[in-house]
Amino acid sequence: MTLRLQRRRFRFALLRPLRTAAGELRERCGWLLRLDDDQGGVGWGEVAPLQLQQFMACEQALAALPDELPQAQLEAVLREAPGPVGFGLGAALAELQGVVGAGAPQGWLKAPAPALLLPAGEAMLAALEVAAASMGGLESCTFKWKVATAPDGLERQLLEQLLQRLPPTARLRLDANGGWDRSTAEAWMQRLRDDPRLDWLEQPLAVEDQAGLDQLAALGPVALDESLDQQPELRSSWSGWQVRRPALEGDPRLLLRELQAGLPQRMLSTAFETGIGRRWLEHLAGLQAQGPTPAAPGLAPGWTPAGPMFSNDPEQVWAAAA
């Protein structure tokens, strides 16, 4: 079967910059993909790397693809392509094949209530107050706070204030984006390991320090994120929680099969997608919620703007990028 591939550039700014130990994220840009077959079927994808070096690799990979190609060639390409390209091509193929979407028995699933993403530093406290006011309290909410962005002493003080404000039914995830050293990460774990509100410390140490991550995981809950992107073999060997960002990790049909098989301790997280990528994120999060270890997905509500670029209708997203 011959497929026709179209690409369209997109760009949008976050509502406010996201500060992490790895830097500051202000906008997202990439390519939307439209894949048509000769039967009138259409599949949609999105390619949006986070790192500049990966952006250039994705641009080269997309430029090397012809506008028309057989399905077998596309399948071969996406297996070797950078992760974001693999996601975009695999997502479009899966929809075209009826694996997901209107042609699938379940259609597109909706995600459960997400975790709330708190900004780094002292802005966290103000954001927490806004959340409490808008929701009428913080009971049974899950919060993710970006840490390792300010002096450790200040963040430890902020942590104590945060813990004082969180009710017993709330849940807390702390994301260091690999920004701590071993002694700092161990100090945070010792403080929090006996707190029933702790979900996990997320990527507390650098990707290169897998031995340190293993040692820390013996003390308390550790979730890997960046490690899974840079060392994909850990997706099959890490026994703790995995923060999975499907838009970055390649063909989404692989993660789809994992969740359909009921593999535990996968938590779905956003890379700030358009409406096309968001459909996949929410569908996978909906599947995860049906599995053995349901967890609030990291959808980062309130960080991306509204409008047709974020519609559930891919035609509207495509038109908005024109």
Predicted features along the sequence, with ranges:
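N-terminal capping/lid subdomain adjacent to the active-site entrance of alpha/beta enzymes
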Residues: 1-172, 177-179, 183, 190-195, ...
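Structural preference for beta-strand elements that scaffold enzyme active sites
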Residues: 32, 86, 111-115, 140-144, ...
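Active-site-proximal loop/turn and secondary-structure-junction residues that shape catalytic pockets
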Residues: 49, 118-120, 147-151, 178-180, ...
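Short flexible/disordered coil segments
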Residues: 63-72, 170, 178-183, 204-210, ...
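Active-site-adjacent beta->alpha loops and helix N-cap segments on the catalytic face
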Residues: 125-126, 149-163, 180-184, 205-217, ...
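Short, aromatic/basic amphipathic alpha-helical patches
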Residues: 131, 162, 187-188, 215-216, ...
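Aromatic-anchored, glycine/proline-accented short structural segments
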Residues: 170-232
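Shared catalytic-loop signature of beta/alpha-barrel
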Residues: 208-209, 215-221, 226-322
